[in-house]
Amino acid sequence: MSILIIEAFYGGSHKQLVDLLQEELGDCVVYTLPAKKWHWRARTSALYFSQTIPISEHYRTLFASSVLNLTELAALRPDLGKLKKILYFHENQLIYPVKKCQERDFQYGYNQILSCLVADVVVFNSVFNMESFLTSMGKFMKLIPDHRPKDLESIIRPKCQVIYFPIRFPDVSRFMPKHKTTHLKKMLGLKGNGGAVLSMALPFQPEQRDSEDLLKNFNSECDTHCGLDTARQEYLGNSLRQESDLKKSTSSDNSSSHHGENKQNLTVDPCDILGGVDNQQRLLHIVWPHRWEHDKDPESFFKVLMHLKDLGLNFHVSVLGETFTDVPDIFSEAKKALGSSVLHWGYLPSKDDYFQVLCMADVVISTAKHEFFGVAMLEAVYCGCYPLCPKDLVYPEIFPAEYLYSTPEQLSKRLQNFCKRPDIIRKHLYKGEIAPFSWAALHGKFRSLLTTEPREDL
């Protein structure tokens, strides 16, 4: 157990990374705190861990997320301070969008800067995360009234590197509707590294025209799609089976307390909805798979959906993602307002159920005001969803320009077109790359990072 992993906020992508490293690297011991009350974890977890983690001569590397105040832990536990200390940034607090700037907010970003000074290696999950942190330090430190420290960026930058968040993409072939099989073939290899292997290049069919061109010209092309009736019928039949399987799986899971909330998340019977759909056109299925918190800007998302309804456009929506202590009021209001448009509502603890919903969806939306990577968006794209993301934050680093929007009005316009012609995006093949973000591509970097030779003074 030479690798000591500490996670002060064991939930979401933080949990996903810890679990992956523990399973794949083996020689690890893990200490965590539940993903509750983030601000209190950032303030107090170092003292808790200093009293909880036993002294061991076997530790060589300490890996922690930036929620932990590494400076406090190293001071409280000099034996841990001597280890090779790796600090991983899922997000940074220097540009966090707060509703109201309060003096206490300064401490969270300040603690992250101090932790970087103590760490031996500082790793970020994206270039955007790293650069936004390093280039914001000067402005951030000007909040100090006087006697400000200097040259922090030049001290910290040499320690920094980017290793993208590693996603272990599962085999979802059993969940894929027929119209996504071409997408699946482009994405998947057969095996390797305990999971699906992705082709390092994701080509699309030469005859596949840009979806924007199709949208501009769809009225003149209607005649060219008259031969799709049989394919659509096959797709609808397959989709009905997939929805039915999910319903049965959820019903079975209700016998377990772990999955006890799943039943309420199936707001309506999917088979009842799909059974009445004209075989010529299944309604567009929009998915929003993010944390139910204000920094993901659910208000903007639901405002766009309500505008679609006001225009008389029909669609289905699945609102997934984890909830924490405080859930914004907009969620209960939106659920009532969206009514029969809702297909799934709430967190799905079962990964199979989660990926099955993604495979059945057509479009995945982000309206985030705070995003440094976006695991859920990439998982949805892997499952064949067409992504629509803000032209901001980390998204231009990950997604081609076609999938970015600049304003809520642009997002609404794109969705209006998709609601009218969902078949256009169902035959679209993603033009970006998924492979660089897979565990298959990144495991070597993490192994090298975490299993390097111990320091000479240990």
UniProtKB/Swiss-Prot annotation:
Tissue: Ubiquitous. Expressed at high levels in the lung, brain, spleen, testis, placenta. ovary, pancreas, spleen and peripheral blood leukocytes. Expressed at low level in the colon, small intestine, kidney, skeletal muscle and thymus. Expressed at high level in colon adenocarcinoma.
Highest taxon above the source species: Eukaryota
Catalytic function, reaction form: queuosine(34) in tRNA(Asp) + GDP-alpha-D-mannose = O-4''-alpha-D-mannosylqueuosine(34) in tRNA(Asp) + GDP + H(+)
Enzyme kind, highest EC tier: transferase
Gene3D superfamilies: Glycogen Phosphorylase B
Cross-referenced InterPro entries: Glyco_trans_1, GT-like_domain_containing_1, QTMAN_N
Subcellular location: Cytoplasm; Nucleus
Any GO CC annotation of this UniProt entry: cytoplasm
Primary localisation category: cytoplasm
Record's compositionally biased regions (Basic and acidic residues): 242-262
GO MF annotations, alphabetized: tRNA-queuosine(34) beta-mannosyltransferase activity
EC numbers: 2.4.1.110
Region (Disordered): 242-267
Residue ranges of coiled coil: none
UniProt keyword list: Cytoplasm, Glycosyltransferase, Nucleus, Transferase
PANTHER family registered for this protein in UniProt: GLYCOSYLTRANSFERASE-LIKE 1, GLYCOSYLTRANSFERASE-LIKE DOMAIN-CONTAINING PROTEIN 1
Family: Belongs to the glycosyltransferase group 1 family. Glycosyltransferase 4 subfamily.
Protein name stated in the entry: tRNA-queuosine alpha-mannosyltransferase
Native source species: Homo sapiens
Gene name of this polypeptide: GTDC1
